[in-house]
Every structure is written in C-alpha cells, then in structure tokens.
Amino acid sequence: MPGSEPYGRLQYREINGKRMAYIDEARGDAIVFQHGNPSSSYLWRNVLPHTEGLGRLVACDLIGMGASDKLDGSGPDSYHYHENRDYLFALWDALDLGDRVTLVLHDWGGALGFDWANRHRDRVAGIVHMETVSVPMEWDDFPDEVAQMFRGLRSPQGEEMVLENNAFIEGVLPSIVMRTLSEEEMIHYRRPFLNAGEDRRPTLSWPRDVPLAGEPAEVVAVIEDFGEWLATSDIPKLFIRADPGVIQGKQRILDIVRSWPNQTEITVPGTHFLQEDSADQIGEAIASFVREIRAGDNLHREAAPEMNSAS
C-alpha cells in the first residue's frame, strides 16, 4: 500500500509578497519535481525516496496550491498560466537551482518545466516527463467523458462545479487514479481547498488554460514555442508513459512526444495521476536515468583533460 505521509519538511520563501512552500533536501545537482493541477508536492511523496543520494531534491507548491499562499482579491483572471509561471520561476530563481538541473514534470508542471528549460537550455541536464501538458490539443484527443468534463469547466457552469462543489478534488482526482485513495491521502489533497469560493480558483483556472482547439492563444503560443525546441533538442529525456493514460493516451499525442530526440520511454500502469499507482517504478526509473546522466558527465570531465593535452 502506498504511503500517505508527506515527504521531507516544507520550507517557505516569500515571492512577490506571498509565501510559497517547497521541499529542499540534500545537496548536489538539483532534481526538481513539479506538480500540476490540483495536486502539490505531496504527489511525489512515494517517488522522492528512490532518488535520495543522487543530488538535491526540490519540489515546489504552485501559488494557491499545496501549502503556498492564496492570492489576494482573486477572480476569473487569476491563477492563469503566466501568473503561475511568474511565481514559480521567481521561486526557482530564489532557490538558485544551479547549472545541472534535472526536471521531473507532470501535468501543468510539464508545460512550466518545458518552458523554463527552453529559456535556460544550458542549465538543463535532463528532463523526465509523464502525462504532461506538452502539445496543443484537440477535443477528440480526450476520452469522451473527459472532454465532456472540460466543456463544463470551461463554461459558466465551471464556477459552480469547482468553486462550490470542489469537483476537481472530490470528483476528477480520485476518478483518474486506478486504486482507491485512502481517506488520509484525500485529507492532504483537500486541505488547500477546504473553503468554498476563491480558495478553489486555481483548480478552475488551470483547466480553462488547457490548450484546446487553439484557445487560449497565449498558452498555445508558449507550448508551440517549447515544442519546436523539444523536437530538436538532444538534452536527455525520459518519457514515463501511463497505461492507459489520459492526456497522452491518444496516438496523435504519443507520436509527437515520441519524436523528441535522445529519449528513452518506459510504460507503467496509471491513468493521469500515475504517481499514485506506480510510484516505485517511476522512482526507480528516474534514479536510473539520473545515474546515467551523472555517468555521462563524469566521462565528459575525464575526456576534457585528454583533449586539452592533445591540443
């Protein structure tokens, strides 16, 4: 049975006047785990132990999520992609992640991490990604029931579904985990969104930003931009595919993601929140991937003096 206890100790940093929460354990080259909607660093609790001893382990809570502060006076224009990006990237800057960063990305953490990597190409040692927002999507890329849910969330009904009824936590989250989440686990996931109304706004803004049928255009542009780079970048990549998956289950999406160069693929059981069903396999795969990167770094360092002496 997967463990329900959080990993590590939450720390806090003030970013743009708001307190943001994060885990920051050990030292060395940073391995940065980034969640999406509606989760938090708690999602990685059973994955992180497998990477102990491999470097500095960092997992941040997005603004308004997990243990991070809520925004003041939020409304329909709050917690969208670019605002989230501003807060997260400022936190990463404040944490001084270094120049050999391995990114481990899920859901909207994927779009954010790919975006950061595209902007800091010379600082990225490797990228691990799973069930990420990574490609502009069409409605038929989703299973019918998921498409119907997103249509509701993106309609005027979305406020009632999420702000009043907490649909993403009480309905969506448990429905796309293969096992049944324990009550203790659900308590952790519910905690940031116990209060009805604007405290739940992040879990509504995110699905309204999913790049569907060309909208919202400003998010599609970001994803197209980093997608062009990923299609040609030789940075080492590990694609952890969920079987059957949700947002990367259709062949069109898989074909695009699989075309990225210098990439290894493994498959684990899971729908969307695969960390809740296959944490051990995911953690072991990440650890193996990081060890391979480290071995390549060592070979490069050993070869450099020989090249210099030969010249």
Curated annotation (Swiss-Prot):
Subunit structure: Monomer.
Domain of life: Bacteria
Keywords for this protein: Hydrolase
Lineage: Bacteria, Bacillati, Actinomycetota, Actinomycetes, Mycobacteriales
One GO MF term attached to the UniProt entry: haloalkane dehalogenase activity
PANTHER family: CIS-3-ALKYL-4-ALKYLOXETAN-2-ONE DECARBOXYLASE (PTHR43798:SF24), MONOACYLGLYCEROL LIPASE (PTHR43798)
Keyword Hydrolase included in the entry's annotation: yes
This protein's name: Haloalkane dehalogenase
